Structures are given as C-alpha cells and as structure tokens.
Amino acid sequence: MRRTTAQVGALLLATMLAAAAAAATRTDGWATIAGWPDFTTGMWAENYDPKSMPKPVLTAQAQLQLQQKPKAAEGNGARCKPLGMPGMMMPGYPMAFFFTKGALFIMSDMDDLLIRHVFLGRQDHGDPDPAWNGHSIAHWDGATLVVDTVAINPEAPLAGLPSGGHTHIVEHIRLTGPDQLEWRSVVSNPDILAQPWAFTKTYVRHRDWELQEASCVEGNRDEPDATGNAHVDLTPPK
C-alpha cells in the first residue's frame, strides 16, 4: 500500500522523537553516574596494616579440617587458579573502578586483570551460576555503595579451606576523603565460620597510576605435576 506524504512525515517524526527520547535517556544515565562519588579516577592501593585485620573464628569442623590439611599443600596460586571472593580483595594489589549504566567493574592487576562485575540497581540475585568472584548486586545508601555477593565458586578459598559455595559477603564502600576509600566487609559461611567475619580495609588513591598487565602462568616455575600438586615443598620451616 502506497503511503501518503503525510503518513511518511508522521513516521519520520515518530522515529526522530523515539531516537531523541533514547538519546535523552542515555544522557540522563551518564549524568546520574557523573553525580556519584568519584571512585573511578586513578587507582586504589591498600593502606595495609596486618595488625588491623582480625582473624576469622572457625567452626570446630573447619578447625579439624585445617589441622588435617597437608602442610605442604599448595594454595590456588601454585596452579594459577583465581583467589575468588573475598580473596580478590585481600592481597593489596592496586584496583580500579569503572562505572557504566547498570554495572560497576572492579579490576585488579593482581593477575590477568581480575574483574568483578557488580550489577547496580537489581533487587535480587535470581538464580546465578557459581563464579570465582560470585554474583554481586549493589545499591547506593547515600554516598555509600552497598554490595551483596553470593554464588561464589565452591573451590574459592576461605580461611585456608575450600568455601563450599555457601559464602555470603556484604560490603560497604565509601570515600572518607578526596583520596581515601573505606571498605567494610562482613563474610558469612556457616560451614567454615563460627561467626560472621567482619573487617575494614582502607585504600589510598594514586591518580597517576595505570593498570599493569600480569600473568601467573608466564614465568611460573612451580608448574603442577600429573596429579595437580606443586613440585615445591611448601612446608613452613621449623
């Protein structure tokens, strides 16, 4: 059917209005992000203080498993496995934040540029597949970002043991100064922890730092044998 000039004009106008509305939505989305606290400039390095880090309180069963664990057993690092959560946030390697509409990406240059994908604005986790860094959703409580993480890979270590897949982490992240970041975490796992493990870390911003490439496998001199065990005896010296 042949359209009239008026019909074609109306169709073009509707298309232009729809495109303008979509562009306005995109612009509004980025304007919203621009109004959030500035986590994204530069990189963050932990202001590490081992004395401020409380030790987790383990269940009796977890204590027994830890005692029976071979002292020479290697950690995930010997086979270049990810540390998972909360391990990714522990070693003190520099991190960077990247916000986009509906998501936050946290990148660490610890090894192979580890990435956490945090979904912003979601109300629930749904039914996610297990992942080394888990499934994270977040919302803003004023100027504090509240992150909730579940579905962590059962092999991800927690207090020296495989977590078993029942770890739940709640984080509160906020700026305490122009170049200071506070990161409060509460880790729960009824199979390993006798009580929630709460700790706070502080980070300092380095505005001129950049993400660096790192590779665990490259240059690795402790490759596993046929059974997957490390060749080097990691038993602590007496």
Please provide the spans of the model-predicted regions.
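Bacterial N-terminal signal peptides that target proteins for export
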Residues: M1-A10
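Bacterial N-terminal signal peptides
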Residues: G9-A19
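Hydrophobic small-molecule pocket/channel-lining residues, especially in calycin-type beta-barrels
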Residues: A21-K238
